[in-house]
């Protein structure tokens, strides 16, 4: 499997919900990363996987079984939905529902938290493009006070990543809005 499109992600999430609903459960996820960029921002056509954190830890084993079943049904890797990005997650802000179907609700973090995660990761051109899109959508085309914006992002930076994220933010701000 290479990349998951919006349609494929929605199909898989819908199926997860069907399976949960059949057992009188509702799965609540906080999606991050590429899946949010695909589902909420239409910023990309596809992503490698769905990074999400289960908001009901008691259902973790249940969710793993369902994810495995959906993977088998679709011929996907077992880790198509995983919590690998949780190391970049500092708390859980509310950016709203980005997908819902019977048995499943998928939320996104607020833009400041998504941007904090992208700045902390800052691995490749994909992260940089995503961060630029998030910044432009959140702040607008004219910018503003970059220190005020940073103060909204900073609480979501994982300890040990602050310097990297700050430099990434300043670099991003300059490339989008200039030196002001």
List PLM regions with ranges.
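Compositionally biased terminal segments of proteins
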Residues: 1-180
């Amino acid at each position: 499997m290479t990349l998951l499109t919006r349609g494929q992600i929605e199909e898989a999430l819908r199926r997860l919900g069907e399976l949960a609903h059949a057992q009188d459960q509702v799965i609540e996820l906080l999606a991050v990363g590429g899946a949010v960029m695909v589902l909420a921002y239409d910023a990309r056509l596809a992503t490698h996987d769905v990074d999400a954190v289960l908001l009901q830890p008691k259902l973790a084993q249940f969710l793993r079984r369902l994810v495995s079943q959906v993977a088998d049904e679709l011929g996907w890797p077992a880790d198509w939905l995983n919590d690998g990005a949780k190391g970049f997650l500092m708390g859980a802000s509310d950016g709203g529902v980005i997908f819902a179907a019977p048995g499943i609700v998928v939320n996104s973090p607020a833009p400041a938290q998504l941007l904090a995660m992208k700045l902390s990761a800052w691995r490749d051109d994909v992260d940089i493009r995503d961060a630029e899109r998030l910044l432009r959508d959140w702040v607008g085309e004219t910018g503003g006070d970059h220190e005020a914006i940073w103060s909204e992002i900073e609480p979501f930076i994982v300890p040990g990543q602050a310097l990297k994220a700050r430099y990434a933010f300043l670099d991003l701000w300059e490339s989008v809005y200039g030196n002001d």
